[in-house]
């Protein structure tokens, strides 16, 4: 009562007079000592307060979070650790206080852990610090290292700063040093849970891809007494090492792997969710997801097997289905649509329809967001992306998805328009109908009498299924409003077409060459200019890290090049007296600006 009445001097005096003499093991002793620590803090005696809070934290689990916070509040970060450690009476107290410093640090705590082990090998906080240090290095080193490995689907979004490579190099040294230290502790016979340290040493070695050392540490850990949690961690670490050290994931290895996946799936079923900050957390569920979408999927990607890579990501989706903290419930389907070419889709379909799937394959098929229905529909779409309309028609005829597209894919407008137009309210077509019309136009383009108009209509169809086109839905399932005017680095053939309109430009040129009417040829050339404008690379924020001055400079240069279309000089010179030129001049501000500057 005196403490909460702000009678801090009374609290200190009464503790020293009465409570300090108490010799019982009652929880009241550490509770009252914490009150004295708080009173010391309130009266400006921070170092003494920090010392008492660390004593109370080590002595009892009662109000431990409160005592941890009290210690943190009492520490002046401008002072050195030794200013506080000097208050401790013995090595055990110094180890306990050092542990509290380490618990609040986001920096490398290995030096502190080494000192704690030297001072008091039996420190119970050391086990917590081991797990925490592993978690920190997973964030600083392992996560960015995994992002450098192509394939799979990382969970949520990631962000990296320009210093990540130097941070990673430094962190890799920390991981290796930590692994060696943990092995020494595990082998020391001075700790009560040596298996935890030895297994953690193995996991740290795994993070740096030192699988030989990881296997040695795992073999040592297996001989030690292990708690059930450490046994589970041993099994997971061993599984990770086994998957990654394998030269190739083949059918025999898949059969060997299946029981481990089923074991984790059973763990998920048995695990009770823990509420943490309003979220329902299930660690085993997250472990399963990460194993499939970030570990096994990447191994298949490394082998060029995008079909099984997609199925691994889809299997992870299925495990996370319905989870309130899992937004990406169709990652497998997104991967299918954004990464597989038609040859990969054919392989995936053959896999899904095989008469004699292995047990591993049957398991993947049974629990997956990627289904045969999705694959069939996308197979047709993938062939449209590659302009193979005959094969697209075959696949669309197999598909149960007959979704209507309510915009005209052959609309001929001089400006880019994504939304449905007023005169299209009753319009309806399908992907199948589009592919059939394009195939018919292909044949008509071979005849001199119909070549020019057929090439032109095909070019319209090709342009309208780009990012800028009227019916992008023919080839995509989602359209961001902030893409365009650049082709993604390492983009697929489809992405280059979708953002660059190269094939459309080629066919407008074919139409112009085949045509004889000057007004028609003017229209073809203007549409070529439209396509060429999309091929001027717009600077992207991601290309400049933090060099915004260079970004601004390149952005200005981009706009100058964007406006000075490479085809405008020819268009003005050769077709300036046509009726279409007047129409284009009235419609296109870039053309007007170009003419005015001449």
Where does each model-flagged region fall?
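Extracytoplasmic/secretory-pathway proteins
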Residues: 1-598
């Amino acid at each position: 009562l005196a403490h909460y009445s702000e009678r801090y001097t009374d609290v200190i005096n009464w503790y020293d007079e009465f409570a300090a003499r108490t010799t019982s093991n009652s929880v009241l002793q550490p509770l009252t000592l914490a009150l004295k620590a708080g009173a010391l803090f309130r009266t400006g005696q921070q170092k003494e307060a920090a010392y008492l809070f660390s004593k109370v934290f080590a002595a009892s689990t009662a109000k431990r979070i409160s005592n941890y916070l009290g210690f943190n509040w009492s520490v002046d970060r401008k002072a050195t650790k030794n200013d506080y450690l000097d208050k401790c009476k013995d090595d055990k107290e110094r180890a306990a206080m050092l542990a509290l410093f380490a618990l609040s640090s986001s920096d490398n705590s290995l030096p502190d852990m080494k000192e704690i082990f030297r001072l008091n090998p039996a420190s119970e906080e050391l086990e917590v610090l081991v797990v925490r240090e592993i978690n920190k290095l997973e964030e600083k080193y392992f996560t960015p290292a995994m992002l450098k490995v192509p394939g799979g689907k990382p969970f949520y979004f990631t962000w990296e700063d320009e210093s990540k490579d130097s941070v990673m190099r430094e962190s890799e040294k920390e991981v290796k040093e930590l692994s060696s230290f943990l092995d020494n502790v595990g082998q020391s016979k001075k700790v009560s849970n040596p298996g935890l340290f030895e297994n953690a040493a193995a996991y740290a070695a795994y993070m740096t891809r030192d699988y030989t050392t990881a296997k040695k540490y795992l073999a040592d850990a297996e001989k030690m007494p292990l708690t059930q949690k450490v046994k589970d961690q041993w099994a997971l670490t061993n599984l990770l090492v086994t998957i990654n050290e394998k030269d190739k994931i083949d059918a025999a290895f898949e059969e060997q792997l299946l029981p481990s996946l089923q074991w984790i799936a059973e763990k998920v079923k048995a695990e009770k969710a823990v509420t943490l900050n309003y979220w329902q957390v299930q660690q085993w569920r997250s472990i399963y997801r990460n194993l499939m979408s970030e570990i096994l999927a990447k191994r298949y990607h490394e082998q060029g097997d995008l079909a099984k890579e997609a199925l691994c990501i889809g299997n992870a989706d299925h495990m996370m289905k319905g989870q309130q903290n899992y937004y990406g419930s169709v990652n497998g389907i997104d991967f299918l649509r954004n990464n597989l070419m038609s040859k990969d889709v054919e392989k995936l379909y053959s896999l899904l329809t095989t008469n004699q799937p292995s047990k591993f394959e049957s398991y993947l098929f049974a629990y997956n967001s990627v289904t045969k229905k999705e694959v069939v529909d996308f197979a047709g779409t993938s062939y449209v992306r590659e302009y193979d309309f005959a094969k697209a028609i075959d696949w669309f005829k197999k598909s149960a998805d007959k979704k209507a597209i309510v915009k005209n894919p052959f609309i001929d407008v001089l400006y880019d328009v994504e939304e449905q137009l007023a005169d299209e309210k009753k319009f309806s077509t399908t992907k199948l109908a589009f592919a059939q019309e394009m195939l018919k136009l292909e044949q008509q383009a071979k005849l001199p009498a119909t070549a020019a108009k057929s090439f032109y209509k095909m070019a319209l169809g090709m342009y309208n299924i780009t990012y800028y086109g009227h019916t992008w839905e023919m080839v995509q399932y989602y359209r961001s409003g902030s893409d365009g005017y650049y082709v993604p680095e390492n983009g697929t053939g489809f992405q280059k077409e979708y953002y660059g309109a190269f094939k459309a430009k080629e066919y407008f040129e074919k139409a112009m060459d085949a045509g004889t009417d000057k007004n028609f040829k003017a229209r073809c050339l203007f549409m070529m200019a439209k396509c060429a404008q999309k091929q001027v690379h717009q600077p992207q924020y991601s290309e400049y890290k933090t060099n915004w001055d260079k970004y601004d400079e390149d952005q200005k240069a981009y706009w100058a090049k964007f406006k000075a279309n490479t085809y405008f000089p020819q268009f003005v010179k050769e077709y300036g007296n046509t009726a279409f030129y007047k129409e284009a001049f009235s419609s296109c501000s870039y053309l007007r600006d170009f003419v005015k500057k001449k």
